[in-house]
C-alpha cells in the first residue's frame, strides 16, 4: 500500500504519514550510538566510532563529534556526508550571528535555525530529507548548560539525558533509571556514559578506540570544549570494569550468605 506514497517526499499517505521522513529516521537507527548527558558543572557527548582503521590519521579525523563555535559542539548519527553539510551550515549560522550582533548565538536559536532548514527538505519536492539526527551541547548566558536533540523532520527538544542511533531505546531506559536529577556531576556523568555504551554497543568488550567522548565546561568565564584522549577513555573503561567486577563479587557473596542461612 505504501509504495504509492513513498516515492515523493511531499506526499502524505492516507494515514497522514510522510514515508520518506520515516525512512530517514530508520537510517539513524542503524548508525553508531550517540548519547548526551547534562550535569550541574558541565555537559558531555559520548559516541560509538564505527570507522577504526589502523591507517586512519586521527589528527584530522573526528567521525562523530564536531565543534561548532566557542560555546557549542554536536554529535551526529546517520549518513556522515549529510552530517558534514549540516555541521558546516551550523558553523556559518553561528559566525553570521557573531558578525552581526558581536555576541555568540544562543544555543536554542542555532538549533532552531538548522531545524528550519531540515523541515524545508520535508516540504519541497525534488529533494530528500537529511538522514541525520544531531545532539547539540552548549552554554549560553540565558540558560547555562544545555543539551538538545533534533531529527530529520526538523523536530527538536531540550533534554537532560538522551541517546540516538543504534540501540537507543535500551540506552534511554538505562539513562532514565540511573540519571539523578540535580545530583549529576560531570565525573558521574562520564561514568554513566561509559556504563550505557558498554551495555548498548554490539561488542563483547568496550575499547577506547571505539569511543569518542567530549566534555563542555566553564573555566574562568570561558567555555572549554575538550575531546578526551584515548588514554583518558581507557581509564574510564578500566574504572567501570573494576566497579562491575566489585558489584559482581558482592552479589555472589550476598547469595552465598543467604544460602548458608
Swiss-Prot record:
Keywords: Acetylation, Cytoplasm, Nucleus, Phosphoprotein, Proteasome. InterPro entries: Ntn_hydrolases_N, Proteasome_alpha, Proteasome_alpha-type, Proteasome_asu_N, Proteasome_bsu_CS, Proteasome_sua/b. One of its GO terms (cellular component) is proteasome core complex, alpha-subunit complex. Residues 240-261 are annotated as: Disordered. Detected in liver (at protein level). Disulfide bonds: none annotated. CDD domains: proteasome_alpha_type_4 (cd03752). The modification Phosphoserine is found at residues 13, 75, 173. The keyword Transferase does not apply. The modification N6-acetyllysine is found at residues 127, 176. GO terms for biological process: ubiquitin-dependent protein catabolic process. Belongs to the peptidase T1A family. The 26S proteasome consists of a 20S proteasome core and two 19S regulatory subunits. The 20S proteasome core is a barrel-shaped complex made of 28 subunits that are arranged in four stacked rings. The two outer rings are each formed by seven alpha subunits, and the two inner rings are formed by seven beta subunits. The proteolytic activity is exerted by three beta-subunits PSMB5, PSMB6 and PSMB7. Component of the 20S core proteasome complex involved in the proteolytic degradation of most intracellular proteins. This complex plays numerous essential roles within the cell by associating with different regulatory particles. Associated with two 19S regulatory particles, forms the 26S proteasome and thus participates in the ATP-dependent degradation of ubiquitinated proteins. PANTHER family: PROTEASOME SUBUNIT ALPHA/BETA (PTHR11599). This is Proteasome subunit alpha type-4. It comes from Mus musculus (Mouse).
Amino acid at each position: 500500500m505504501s509504495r504509492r506514497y513513498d516515492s515523493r517526499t511531499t506526499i502524505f499517505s492516507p494515514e497522514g504519514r510522510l514515508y520518506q521522513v520515516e525512512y530517514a529516521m530508520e537510517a539513524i537507527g542503524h548508525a553508531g550510538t550517540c548519547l548526551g548527558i547534562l550535569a550541574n558543572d558541565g555537559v558531555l557527548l559520548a559516541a560509538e566510532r564505527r570507522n577504526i582503521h589502523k591507517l586512519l590519521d586521527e589528527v584530522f579525523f573526528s567521525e562523530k563529534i564536531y565543534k561548532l563555535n566557542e560555546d557549542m559542539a554536536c554529535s551526529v548519527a546517520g549518513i556522515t556526508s549529510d552530517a558534514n553539510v549540516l555541521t558546516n551550515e551550523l558553523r556559518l549560522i553561528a559566525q553570521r550571528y557573531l558578525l552581526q550582533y558581536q555576541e555568540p548565538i544562543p544555543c536554542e536559536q542555532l538549533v532552531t535555525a538548522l531545524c528550519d532548514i531540515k523541515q524545508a527538505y520535508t516540504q519541497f519536492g525534488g529533494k530528500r530529507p537529511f538522514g541525520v539526527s544531531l545532539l547539540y551541547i552548549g552554554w549560553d548566558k540565558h540558560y547555562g548548560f544545555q543539551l538538545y536533540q533534533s531529527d530529520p523532520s526538523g523536530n527538536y527538544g531540550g533534554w537532560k539525558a538522551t541517546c540516538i542511533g543504534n540501540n537507543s531505546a535500551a540506552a534511554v531506559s538505562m539513562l532514565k533509571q540511573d540519571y539523578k536529577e540535580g545530583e549529576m556531576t560531570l565525573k558521574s556523568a562520564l561514568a554513566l556514559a561509559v556504563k550505557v555504551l558498554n551495555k548498548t554497543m554490539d561488542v563483547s568488550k568496550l575499547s577506547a578506540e571505539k569511543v569518542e567522548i567530549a566534555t563542555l565546561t566553564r573555566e574562568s568565564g570561558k567555555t572549554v570544549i575538550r575531546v578526551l584522549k584515548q588514554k583518558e577513555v581507557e581509564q574510564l573503561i578500566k574504572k567501570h570494569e573494576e566497579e562491575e567486577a566489585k558489584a559482581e563479587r558482592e552479589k555472589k557473596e550476598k547469595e552465598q550468605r543467604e544460602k548458608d542461612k
